[in-house]
Swiss-Prot record:
Main localisation: membrane
Lineage of the species this protein comes from: Eukaryota, Metazoa, Chordata, Craniata, Vertebrata
Expression by tissue: Brain (neuronal synapse).
Protein name per UniProt: Neurexin-2
PTM notes: O-glycosylated; contains heparan sulfate. Heparan sulfate attachment is required for synapse development by mediating interactions with neuroligins.
Extracellular side: 30-1639
Chain's gene name: Nrxn2
Role: Neuronal cell surface protein that may be involved in cell recognition and cell adhesion. May mediate intracellular signaling.
SUPFAM superfamilies: Concanavalin A-like lectins/glucanases
Name of one Pfam family that matches: Laminin_G_2
Keywords assigned by UniProt, alphabetized: Calcium, Cell adhesion, Cell membrane, Cell projection, Disulfide bond, EGF-like domain, Glycoprotein, Heparan sulfate, Membrane, Metal-binding, Proteoglycan, Repeat, Signal, Synapse, Transmembrane, Transmembrane helix
Species in which this protein is naturally found: Rattus norvegicus (Rat)
Length: 1715
């Protein structure tokens, strides 16, 4: 509920007088309660939004209908009933769930009660006498629709049920009793009709003509024919306010029967009695009233006239809404009188020196803090009392009598021997400077309200204290802003803390030597921090533990339902349980804390507990604010919280209600403070909902629901989910034995209580899961797997902190729970520590323990998982973890998820996000004769072995260790099954794995071999387990070396008879775990025989459906394949490794890549791919800006939780978005965007591709065709003309910077970003490598390490230029005959180019599309080269030095397969038909077909067509010179498979990026799905002239790129910026028009091609008769191959001699053909 106004009675008049005032002058109606009774009033218009309805009632009925209205039978209604003698209100708006209010005040007592109903939009308040409550409905609409009249006491019979929204109201019993003064706002409503009403309505006794009340008295109809007069505000008395002055303000039915003017109720009272008879009063006198607001009081100085009395009397009247407060006090030490209001009751304490006499007076119903006047009289008189003792004689004692309102009286006797009240101090009225320090005071706060006519009288004199204060007597001292009239004092509204995160910050509490705090609280929750404040840790340094450097603190907390006080004044703390019973019972609990120096007391519900602080300090020095209800989020980390305050460390804020907070006797307006601070989760009022919150089963995904205070609490531990209702999937981290996550806390943490929970899954029996570590001590709390059990270790380094020897424990405490937890299933572990108590739970099986010693403080700087990196104080390092961890929550902090989302900046990790297959440290045994020898296996009493293997061989020895006598152990592969053979001295035994099929299937399999101390052997293959019990010998005594993978040949013959292996293992081994030790098989080997190498890439050499994951594109090569991962956000050989990942923290961060001024590219096409995860609904991910002044830009952003792109390349802003994919869910998403001119596509994950085609493309295509015919010398003129005409606004000009993170745009991104790729640039990878062009700023963290460079000198250029690869696996070569060029060696610089045709020069010499450039200049810093034809050995002419400008990043790389080309850019299929229709189309195994395929971008003997246009000018391809009009005659056909031929120009993709995995569609490699009819599937060729790829088109299905990925997801098309499907390819249409003018050229080209084929056939003949030589193809590194193999050429031992030209690279001989 929002903080809103609470109903209070109107000012000036107390409720009783208000009742009388409202009833006066208005007719009363008597309802008989008979059938058919009703009253109908005019419609209450104020009920629609804001308004008040009030009336008075008197009844003895327990159930009846009072009021009803509705909207005519639709949704809204308001109903006021009597239920069980109490008022119940129900209402609703807009068909929302009805709200219900049930008041506690009984009204069926046949007495008058005042009712006020207040409407305020969705909120309605109901008040009866002094009780008020409010409720609110959760409706869409704020206003209530009111269509009916106001029905009172019943429903007329003519109202149909269908016209009633709440039809049951018609069957409620009619009201029986009196109802008077019904008002809507300030006016009575018009009575439209009635039935069954009697008496009062017909006799207007209080009408002006008959009003009997004189002097302005208020007339009230009490009963038929009977009236009463309220004279309280007139100054007169009597039945009709006509007799002199009345002594006090009060209702007409009060009796004056005291000789000193004390007033007593003879009947009734507000909320308790009816209107009784008015007795004849004595002569009135002037009243002396004062208002106290908590900080005011006055005192009379008795030092000059001390009191010595034996008989005395105190009288006063009070009116308040406050439950606690000091009204009067005199005396000190052991001689005093104290009169207070405590919990709404009057409390009297008298001590005459021998002990205190206490009396408590409570009303029968309600409380005295009802804002009505109450009169108190205290007397002490001498009485004779029969004593009981030795003498059994009568003694004189003093009788003490206290009466409140004349009828509530308590009597008692003071202690004997002390009869005189002596006081020479002060007479305090309404409060004191320090109420908590007054002797005998049951309260610690001053009075708030009105006090009137305070008089003290004894035998000798009379002190009219109120009069003396008003008249300014010199002996009277006034404190504060006293007002000598009765004013309304706002009640201290309670507040509700609705969540553990809610808190209110109070001003700093200055309580150095003395102080007091009192409050009431109410909750049902067992734990919570109520109050907390602390001082500065004076002189504290790192690692300081001296007691002199302790910080002072004060706290109150609830633990397990008990209230605890915690106090430390710098010399030692105390922790005191203040309540003897649990106080979380949902009832109000009053707490009163008082301190004076080291001494003090805390009282809980009047049960006081004294305390004495330890040490010598008496000063409590608090520097921080005083926090109520909890701590701020930042304060939990930044403040060095005292470890003794357990709820602070556990982040357990208080949930419940708090009221009446007084600090040092002064009130604190909690509601006002909460409103001023905008406190989240702090609501006004306090109500306890009776409905069970868990009844609706709100917890999802198996979460356990428990009831809280007006809330439910979901326990998500063990579910794999987090969040309020377990709705958010917890982050999973995968560990391979070398990975970790480390939380490096900003400050050293000291705790005495911890709650830790996590889930794990592992196949290893050993491994560290979580540990706290300290840089300065051996303190640790560690969870690890130990022999398949969960082991908890808690070590508290007592010696390190200098604690007393008696406090030291016996050493680390350990607990074990669970068994066989290494079953590759999810398990849940939880640790709960409270001081010395330990609790370890695994899968709901709990083990408890108790720590020895008094020292309980745990110090830590780090929380580590996977690997324990802080090892200075540990003797035995736990084994590294291999497996998966999830849902790590440490003291309320979900660190894994916070680390992933960037919520914390002190996280370091290289573990991989997501549930990934784990293969740790794989090694490959290349031959059966290869093996390793390690140190002896230690397996004497027990053993736990684990490893993974992958092979195609059916047999082989995996592990062998011999021992003393006949002891040995063997693990081997026999006919595809695992055998475990062992001998412990009882003879050899064999166990065979029961896998359902042979395991030599080239898949990874997991093997677990264990033996427990009970001699139970276990063999587990994947998920299938075999066990065997052995008798006899229990120990395995091994010696000698442990052999892995095989043995020497002469040793096989000596193996025991049950061992079948006669050869070694050939395949891969990984994740080898030897009893908790993870050896590095190669580094730790004592001997390594044969070919044993790191890594395991498998034997596959052909692109298959599973070759590349995450939509990576398989690129077939001569002896293998590589995966192009550029548009996946992943890396690695098969696109399954995380791309370079950065986590952007809360404060925002920015990564900026800036092109050098001379190398700024201008592009007509752009490719962007990025992976990310976030919970933000609005942020900017990536932005690319052009140079200053141009205004071109491209921006990828998140808006309302969805991804969108906006770009501008010179025209208007163009937007494209994906509204269906919500990406703000914290999961990993991959976005792919492509742009070609104004066309754009956007794809999120596997959602369908969104495409956008701005109008006007057709004109642009035609102009592009025409542009190619213009000679170079006129090209600039035409470009300027086109620019003037607005035709060339499709180019992203002069790109200057790429900015990642959105910090500069005011919409910073928070989360992780992986594998970003933009036009050949991998900016995140460059940032990780500290590239000089990259700048980082803000809260940024690199996950793991940056990508390593695995490229040789020969393959660096090849891999970096994988972006230029076409990605289909069918390829032919088109040979150009119009240009002669000569190549240079692949130096990653610009190639030298010479053109002989102006037409071609115009299109090819200047590839830049930047129309702002004045001339075409060669670039000296470019990293890409132009592929050329090596045709002659002549040096290039001087003109060749003017090579085209080539921007460093490629701006042309196709998105996956066909996505890089539009219809504008592609040659029609007819242009490719001659190449694809030759004799080598169907079968490509023949060498004659393979020989000509020598296409590359690196001048290594490849043939290219120089007539192709610049890279980013896609329009040029429409005039490809080999095009014929046969395109339109082709019928769709399936492309011929060529599995062993790689794609042109691509030798590999940079498979070294790291990024989290994400599911992706699974499509067959090499198969294309064409979206549009006759659409060619051709990638953009490399920069400069290249070789187009011929591929047969298919009509029916939509275009699908040839991608490979993991299965299980829909096969959806990827982005492809092509024209709309209903339009024919414009390029083909335009080319047909040109064909008649190029017939001669085509004939020449065909003739030249035939000549080339003859020459090549001859060359192949020579090639096949060469000396073959011998060579071995290493299949373990297919992603790094030499360029000759990459281009389909056959590797020769001896290349034919050729002229030495710059185009020759080492080990890569060029084969040159001359045409």
């Amino acid at each position: 509920m929002a903080l809103g106004s609470r109903w209070r009675p109107p000012p000036q008049l107390p409720p009783l007088l208000l009742l009388l005032a409202l009833v006066a002058g208005v007719r009363g109606l008597e309802f008989g309660g008979g059938p058919g009774q009703w009253a109908r009033y005019a419609r209450w218009a104020g009920a629609a939004s804001t308004g008040e309805l009030s009336f008075s009632l008197r009844t003895n009925a327990t159930r009846a209908l009072l009021l009803y209205l509705d909207d005519g039978g639709d949704c809204d209604f308001l109903e006021l009933l009597l239920v069980d003698g109490r008022l119940r209100l129900r209402f609703t708006l807009s068909c929302a769930e009805p709200a219900t209010l049930q008041l506690d005040t009984p009204v069926a007592d046949d007495r008058w009660h005042m009712v006020l109903l207040t409407r305020d939009a969705r909120r309605t308040a109901l008040a009866v006498d002094g009780e008020a409550r409010a409720a609110e409905v959760r409706s869409k609409r704020r206003e209530m629709q009111v269509a009916s009249d106001l029905f009172v006491g019943g429903i007329p019979p003519d109202v149909r049920l269908s016209a009633l929204t709440l039809s049951t109201v018609k069957y409620e019993p009619p009201f029986r009793g009196l109802l008077a003064n019904l008002k809507l706002g300030e006016r009575p409503p018009a009575l439209l009709g009635s039935q069954g009403l009697r008496g009062a309505a017909a006799d207007p006794l209080c009408a002006p003509a008959r009003n009997p009340c004189a002097n302005g008295g208020l007339c009230t109809v009490l009963a038929p024919g009977e009236v009463g007069c309220d004279c309280s505000h007139t100054g007169f008395g009597g039945k009709f306010c006509s007799e002199g002055e009345h002594p006090m303000e009060g209702p007409a039915h009060l009796t004056l029967n005291s000789p000193v003017g004390s007033l007593l109720f003879s009947e009734g009272g507000a909320g308790r009695g009816g209107a009784g008879d008015v007795h004849q009063p004595t002569k009135g006198k002037e009243e002396f009233v004062a208002t106290f607001k908590g900080n005011e009081f006055f005192c009379y100085d008795l030092s000059h006239n001390p009191i010595q009395s034996s008989t005395d009397e105190i009288t006063l009247a009070f009116r308040t809404l406050q439950r606690n407060g000091l009204m009067l006090h005199t005396g000190k030490s052991a001689d005093y009188v104290n009169l207070s209001l405590k919990s709404g009751a009057v409390w009297l304490v008298i001590n005459l020196g021998s002990g205190a006499f206490e009396a408590l007076v409570e009303p029968v119903n309600g409380k005295f803090n009802d804002n009505a006047w109450h009169d108190v009289r205290v007397t002490r008189n001498l009485r004779q009392h029969a004593g009981i003792g030795h003498a059994m004689v009568n003694k004189l004692h003093y009788l003490v009598t206290i009466s409140v309102d004349g009828i509530l009286t308590t009597t008692g006797y003071t202690q004997e021997d002390y009869t005189m009240l002596g006081s020479d101090d002060f007479f305090y009225i309404g409060g004191s400077p320090n109420t908590a320090d007054l002797p005998g005071s049951p309260v610690s706060n001053n009075f708030m309200g009105c006090l009137k006519d305070v008089v003290y009288k004894n035998n000798d004199f009379k002190l009219e204290l109120s009069r003396l204060a008003k008249e300014g007597d010199p002996k009277m001292k006034l404190q504060g802003d006293l007002s000598f009239r009765c004013e309304d004092v706002a009640a201290l509204d309670p507040v509700t803390f609705e969540s553990p995160e809610a808190f209110v910050a109070l001003p700093r509490w200055s309580a150095k030597r003395t102080g007091s705090i009192s409050l009431d609280f109410r909750t049902t929750e067992p734990n919570g921090l109520l109050l907390f404040s602390q001082g500065r840790r004076a002189g504290a340094g790192v690692g300081s533990h001296s007691s002199s450097q302790r910080a002072d603190y004060f706290a109150m907390e609830l633990l397990d339902g008990y209230l605890y006080l915690l106090l430390d004044m710098g010399s030692g703390g105390i922790k005191l349980r203040a309540s003897s019973r649990k106080v979380n019972d949902g009832e109000w609990c009053h707490v009163d804390f008082q301190r004076d120096g080291r001494k003090g007391s805390i009282s809980v519900n009047s049960r006081s507990t004294p305390f004495l602080a330890t040490g010598e300090s008496e000063v409590l020095d608090l520097e921080s604010e005083l926090y109520l209800g909890g701590l701020p989020e930042g304060g939990r980390v930044d403040l060095p919280l005292p470890p003794e305050v357990w709820t602070a460390a556990l982040r357990a804020g208080y949930v419940g209600c708090v009221r009446d907070l007084f600090i040092d006797g002064r009130s604190r307006d909690l509601r006002g403070l909460a409103e001023a601070q905008g406190a989240v989760g702090v609501a006004p009022f306090c109500s306890r909902e009776t409905l069970k919150q868990c009844a609706s089963a709100p917890c999802r995904n198996g979460g356990i629901c428990r009831e809280g205070w007006n809330r439910f609490v979901c326990d998500c531990i063990g579910t794999g989910f987090l969040g309020r209702v377990c709705e958010r999937e917890a982050t999973v981290l995968s560990y391979d034995g070398s990975m970790y996550m480390k939380i490096m806390l900003p400050n050293a943490m000291h705790t005495e209580a911890e709650d830790v929970s996590l889930r794990f899954m592992s196949q290893r029996a050993y491994g560290l899961m979580m540990a706290t570590t300290s840089r300065e001590s051996a303190d640790t709390l560690r969870l690890e797997l130990d022999g398949g059990q969960m082991k908890l270790t808690v070590n508290l380094d007592c010696l390190r902190v200098g604690c007393a020897p008696s406090a030291a424990g016996k050493g680390p405490e350990t607990l074990f729970a669970g068994h066989k937890l290494n079953d590759n299933e999810w398990h849940t572990v939880r640790v709960v520590r409270r001081g010395k108590s330990l609790q370890l739970s695994v899968d709901n099986v709990t083990v408890e323990g108790q720590m020895a010693g008094a020292h309980t403080r745990l110090e830590f700087h780090n929380i580590e998982t996977g690997i324990m990196t802080e090892r200075r104080f540990i003797s035995v390092v736990p084994s590294n973890f291999i497996g998966h961890l999830s849902g790590l929550v440490f003291n309320g902090q979900p660190y894994m998820d916070q680390c992933k989302d960037g919520d914390i900046t002190y996280c370091e990790l290289n573990a991989r996000f997501g549930l990934r297959a784990i293969v740790a440290d794989p090694v490959t045994f290349k031959s059966r004769s290869s093996y390793l020898a390690l140190a002896t296996l230690q397996a004497y009493a027990s053993m736990h072995l684990f490893f993974q293997f992958k092979t195609t061989a059916p047999d082989g020895l995996l592990l062998f260790n011999s021992g003393n006598g006949n002891d040995f152990i063997v693990i081997e592969l026999v006919k595809g099954y695992i055998h475990y053979v062992f001998d412990l001295g009882n003879g050899p035994s064999l166990m065979k794995g029961n896998s359902d099929k042979p395991v030599n299937d080239n898949q990874w399999h997991n093997v677990v071999v264990s033996r427990d101390p009970g001699n139970v052997h276990t063999l587990k293959i994947d998920s299938r387990t075999v066990t065997q019990h052995s008798n006899g010998a229990r120990n395995l005594d091994l010696k000698g070396e442990l052999y892995i993978g095989g043995l020497s040949k002469n040793m096989f013959s000596n193996l025991p008879k049950l061992v079948a292996s006669r050869d070694g293992f050939q395949g891969c081994l990984a994740s080898v775990d030897l009893n908790g030790r993870l050896p590095d098989l190669i580094a730790d080997a004592l001997h390594r025989i044969g070919q044993v190498e790191r890594g395991c890439d498998g034997p596959s050499t052909t692109c298959t459906e599973e070759s590349c994951a995450n939509q990576g594109v398989c690129l077939q090569q001569w002896d293998g394949f590589t995966c192009d991962c550029t548009m996946t956000s992943y890396g690695g050989p098969v696109c399954n490794d995380p791309g370079t990942t950065y986590i952007f923290g809360k404060g925002g961060a920015l990564i900026t890549y800036t092109w050098p001024p001379n190398d700024r590219p201008s592009t007509r096409m752009d490719r962007l791919a990025v992976g990310f995860s976030t919970h933000q609904r609005s942020a900017v991910l990536v932005r690319v800006d052009s140079a200053s002044g141009l205004g071109d830009y491209l921006q990828l952003h998140i808006d309302q939780g969805t991804v969108g792109v906006i770009f501008n390349v010179g025209t208007d802003d163009i937007t494209i978005d994906e509204p269906n994919a919500i990406v703000s869910d914290g999961k990993y998403h991959v976005v792919r965007f492509t742009r070609s001119g104004g066309n754009a596509t956007l794809q999120v994950d596997s959602w369908p591709v969104n495409e956008r085609y701005p109008a006007g493309n057709f004109d642009n295509e035609r102009l592009a065709i025409a542009r190619q015919r213009i000679p170079y010398r006129l090209g600039r003129v035409v470009d300027e003309w086109l620019l003037d005409k607005g035709r060339q606004l499709t180019i992203f000009n002069s790109q200057a910077a790429i900015k990642i993170g959105g910090r500069d745009q005011g919409r910073p991104f928070q989360g992780q970003v992986s594998g970003l790729y933009y036009n050949g640039l991998k900016v995140l990878a460059l940032a990780a490598e500290s590239d000089p062009n990259v700048r980082t700023e803000g809260h940024l963290r690199l996950v793991g390490e940056g990508p390593s460079v695995l490229l040789s000198a020969e393959t660096t250029a090849t891999t970096l230029l994988a972006d230029m690869a076409t990605t289909i696996m069918e390829t032919t070569t088109t040979m150009a005959t119009t240009t002669t060029r000569r190549g240079r060696s692949p130096t990653m610089r610009d190639s030298t180019t010479q053109n002989t045709d102006d037409l071609l020069v115009a299109s090819a010499e200047c590839p830049s599309d930047d129309e702002d450039l004045e001339e075409c200049e060669p670039s000296t810093g470019g990293e890409l080269i132009l592929p050329i034809i090596t045709e002659d050995s002549l040096d290039p002419p001087p003109v060749a030095t003017r090579s085209p400008f080539v921007p460093p990043p490629p701006t042309f790389y196709p998105f996956l397969t066909g996505v890089g080309a539009t219809q504008d850019t592609l040659p029609p299929p007819a242009a490719r038909r001659p190449s694809s229709g030759g004799p080598c189309q169907a079968e490509r195994d023949d060498s004659d077909c393979e020989e000509p395929v020598e296409a590359s971008g690196f001048a290594s003997g490849e043939v290219f067509d120089s007539s192709l246009p610049p890279t980013d000018d896609e329009d040029f391809y429409t005039t490809f010179p080999l095009v014929t009009d046969r395109t339109t005659l082709l019928s769709p056909r399936k492309p011929a498979p060529r599995p062993n031929l790689r794609t042109d120009g691509a030798t590999g993709a940079p498979g070294v990026l790291l990024a989290p995995s994400a599911p992706a569609p699974n499509l067959p490699a090499g198969k294309m799905n064409h979206r549009d009819p006759l659409q060619p599937l051709l990638e953009n060729p490399p920069l400069g002239p290249g070789v187009p790829t011929a591929f047969e088109p298919r009509r029916p299905p939509p275009l699908r790129p040839g991608v490979t990925s993991v299965p299980g997801f829909p096969r959806l098309p990827t982005a492809n910026p092509t024209g709309p499907g209903e339009r024919g390819p414009p390029g083909a249409v335009e080319v047909i028009r040109e064909s008649s003018s190029t017939t001669g050229m085509v004939v020449g080209i065909v003739a030249a091609a035939a000549l080339c084929i003859l020459i090549l056939l001859y060359a192949m003949y020579k090639y096949r008769n060469r000396d073959e030589g011998s060579y071995q193809v290493d299949q373990s590194r297919n992603y790094i191959s030499n360029s000759a193999q990459s281009n389909g050429a056959v590797v020769k031992e001896k290349a034919p001699a050729a002229p030495k030209t710059p185009s020759k690279a080492k080990k890569n001989k060029d084969k040159e053909y001359y045409v």
